Amino acid sequence: MLTKDLSVTFCGVKFPNPFCLSSSPVGNCYEMCAKAYDTGWGGIVFKTIGFFIANEVSPRFDHLTKEDTGFIGFKNMEQIAEHPLEENLAAIRRLKQDYPDKVLIASIMGENEQQWQELARLVEEAGADMIECNFSCPQMTSHAMGSDVGQSPELVEKYCRAVKRGSSLPMLAKMTPNIGDMCEVALAAKRGGADGIATINTVKSITNIDLNRKIGMPVVNGKSSISGYSGKAVKPIALRFIQQLRMHPELRDFPISGIGGIETWEDAAEFLLLGAATLQVTTGIMQYGYRIVEDMASGLSHYLADQGFASLQEMIGLANGNIIPAEDLDRSYIVYPRINQEKCVGCGRCYISCYDGGHQAMEWDEHSRTPHCNTEKCVGCLLCGHVCPVACIDLGEVKFKKGEKEHALTL
């Protein structure tokens, strides 16, 4: 297995690799965190601790599927750590004693300035390397905490200042995606002394309704609630927020820990290319186990070698220059689909989708059960390629629109 140096320095702390557990059930106690370290994770954000002790519901999870796939989206109704504060602090102490070279980040959540300041002091005394301020849990809003705080720049700035009074450790502010402009809150966190941003937390959601009982899922004694949604389905949302943060002139160099739908090395590379420097994972671990880090580290190592990068740092943020406003995109040409008839299985998916959801440009030969593109009707949307189950449709002939001057293209 190829292994390159995947170490990265983030907010002044050196991580052996960028892969971390996010604050969640996967890092809830000493035993779980020790196993994660032994498996190869570079850092752990211990499940959020506070003076509030959670009393969890049962059941507390739901998921969303697509056809015959595993779940693509995951709903959880968990709150912060259910163990007493001293028990959590003892776990942090023991982890740092047993794994001094691994990074341990303490996630904290308070109800007021005094609690934020005291929690920061306590986790620094316990040996944590960094602090993550959880301003974004959707399940904690009724306790004057969680994502409601993360929607208020004033509260975020105030609580960041309180944490800085209690500790000298590097501090991250964890952002909620349940907001229109994350940059405004990130700037408030920066003013308050935050050293970086962690984003995104889960998206407020209702995943499913039991059609017979007319109750949201999961059902807790005949009721349900809105709560956090995670997994592969939220990755595009996370990438969008990270790109917007990175392109803000006052946040360009502000460190970001990326979270949201990371399961593979390709996912990891996408977050890095948009500007995240460390990566946090929960739902992928819940679905596949801690050992996914082995494939992610190996795949990322091969990618660095193939691309000629000497270090992980060299690739961070490289894709941002190619994300531009929609009105600035080149609209001078059409790309027609190219169909590999040898790979085509004659399922007709492209024909149906084009006829019912496109521009009726895909024609169907019933005798040979093969599709053909009518370029007189085709607008080059490439819907056909996206629905093809065997990937036999890709980019083909390019035609410049009437009156447009031909020029070099990157497709």
UniProtKB/Swiss-Prot annotation:
Positions annotated to bind [4Fe-4S] cluster 1: C344, C347, C350, C388
Name by which UniProt lists this protein: NAD-dependent dihydropyrimidine dehydrogenase subunit PreA
CDD domains reported in the protein's UniProt record: DHPD_FMN
Annotated binding of [4Fe-4S] cluster 2, by residue: C354, C378, C381, C384
Annotated GO biological process: pyrimidine nucleobase catabolic process
Manner of cofactor binding, per the entry note: Binds 2 [4Fe-4S] clusters.
Domain 4Fe-4S ferredoxin-type: 335-367, 369-398
Keyword presence, Flavoprotein: no
Organism the protein comes from: Salmonella typhimurium (strain LT2 / SGSC1412 / ATCC 700720)
Family: Belongs to the dihydropyrimidine dehydrogenase family.
